[in-house]
Amino acid sequence: MSALEWYAHKSLGDGIFWIQERFYESGNRANIWLVRGSEQDVVIDTGLGLRSLPEYLYSSGLLQDREAKEDAARRPLLAVATHVHFDHSGGLYQFDRVAVHHAEAEALARGDNFETVTWLSDSEVVRTPSPGWRARQFRVQAVQPTLILQDGDVINLGDRQLTVMHMPGHSRGSICLHDKDRKILFSGDVVYDGSLIDWLPYSRISDYVGTCERLIELVDRGLVEKVLPGHFNTFGAERLFRLASNYISKAGICHKVSTFAMRSLASLALRVTNSRTSP
């Protein structure tokens, strides 16, 4: 199957494109975002990487400008992982320039498939990317990041800037990217319109509460109008406030006890199915 068949996209305007893997039918299917800039383009998360995402970006014309095709072809392209979980980081190995938060840089460099929580089944991939492919073959490949991110760093695209916000809780290196001028938040799995997951091996409820407090502050200060999440559909500031507030209100003793049990089971299952490093 070609890359052009595997992926699909739609434009949200203002140089932002929403890309998805068509034949990965799962709640884990991650949103891939392409953000065009005057001096640099950024891909936010890369999906599973079962087909070449860079090939799709070029073949579909997403990295070309009608007025200046040659300049666009030479424009730097940076792949940023909002975190290293498999559904977001699987395609990072296809890019020359890769950025990740420092808390998860070592796991990515090792190809640590326990920390990437690799969990994929044949039934979720409804059309195999190549003959004989099986989900048990899938691993997140080790990638040496070329850019280590910290809270407050700014990724300069020329005519727009993306500010890194370290937002742990879902994972220890989770980040959001904030386009302050346009009041857009690329949230990864920090927040999306669904049940927030805090029971994975490196999740931490206390961190998540602090992260949700930061999200509420963004809304209160009028700094976010639109959220482009790691899963499901986009939403606005009012929904962001409600999602963050609901998490904080539910993060009591009972939630912590049940989450501890779920984390223990998830960790056991992941250790059985994944080696610490990719082959």
From Swiss-Prot:
Q: Where in the cell is it found?
A: Endoplasmic reticulum membrane; Cell membrane
Please name the GO terms of the biological process aspect recorded for this protein, alphabetically.
fatty acid metabolic process
Effect seen on changing C212A: No effect on ZDHH20-catalyzed palmitoylation
Q: Kindly give the CDD domains that the UniProt entry links to this protein.
A: MBLAC2-like_MBL-fold
Its protein name is: Acyl-coenzyme A thioesterase MBLAC2
**UniProt remark on cofactor binding:** Binds 2 Zn(2+) ions per subunit.
First and last residue of the signal peptide? none
Q: Which residues bind Zn(2+) 1?
A: H83, H85, H170, D189
Q: Which domain of life is it from?
A: Eukaryota
Known EC number? 3.1.2.2, 3.5.2.6
- Family membership noted in the UniProt record: Belongs to the metallo-beta-lactamase superfamily. Glyoxalase II family.
Instruction: List GO terms (cellular component aspect).
Output: endoplasmic reticulum membrane; extracellular exosome; mitochondrion; plasma membrane
Keyword check for Cytoplasm: no
Q: How the protein sits in the membrane?
A: Lipid-anchor
Q: Which residues carry this modification: N-acetylserine?
A: S2
Top EC category: hydrolase
Lipidation sites (S-palmitoyl cysteine):
C254
Q: Which GO terms describe its molecular function?
A: beta-lactamase activity; long-chain fatty acyl-CoA hydrolase activity; metal ion binding
What kind of modification does the protein receive after translation?
Palmitoylated on Cys-254 by ZDHHC20.
**InterPro entries documented for this protein:** Metallo-B-lactamas (IPR001279), NDM-1-like (IPR050855), RibonucZ/Hydroxyglut_hydro (IPR036866)
